Amino acid sequence: MYEKPSAPRPVGGVIDDAIKLYRESFRRCAPIGVLGAMVSTAFDLMVIELAHREGLPLTSLEALVRVYQEPPVMALNLLQIVLLLALFGALIVTQNAVSNGEPEPLVIQALGVGFARLGRCVIAAVISMVLILVGCLLIVPGIYLSGILSLWPIAMYVDDAGAIQSLDASRRIIRGNWWHASTVLAVAMLIALAFSMFAGFVAGVIQLVSGAGAAGQSMVQIIGAAANVFLLPMLPAAMIALANDVKQRQRLAGAPR
């Protein structure tokens, strides 16, 4: 059972807390994860349909790049990202309630918060991405900014901060704990990546056995959608566990000695 830390936790302890929070909150997050999987699957199917209509086989990287450069696909991809940002916020709201031992919010309530704050979420996401990309031109600043700004969604969906305020809140939360926070998030992303690669491997094996026909492609889509239901709540759980740990570190650092 997940409990907020009463003392600073090592990296492994925070990951363990994140896993506990993920498991405890999964039942509540599953409907939101299903919606996210539906959004991603719908986008994939539209890309496949467009490729077939244009006579572009999706058997090479070059063909795939050409399809994704089509204006309709680019517009649909932006729409997918915006919708997933709202669902990401809804997952944070739901998992934060679990971490605080609060009554279970209805799915519609969590979605309402996710979409109500979508405007400021998009602004914060764009600003943070621009800052990180510009910083990446000098390598080190980009790496630093990717860590120091990583908890802005928590500030926005837990503390109801604005777009700029959430970025500043993330900076203040992580300041002094950059290595710790970056390591936790890196481990969490590696776990999610490993799960995604495993699901892709299973889908590839099934498609190899079933062939490249409609049945094989349908099985791949089903496996991908099912994997997304489990995958989408992973990072929010890690971010909440990390935020709770870092806040505890700051409280102890500011306590009188």
Predicted feature locations:
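Residue-level signature of the transmembrane alpha-helical core
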Residues: 30, 34, 38, 78, ...
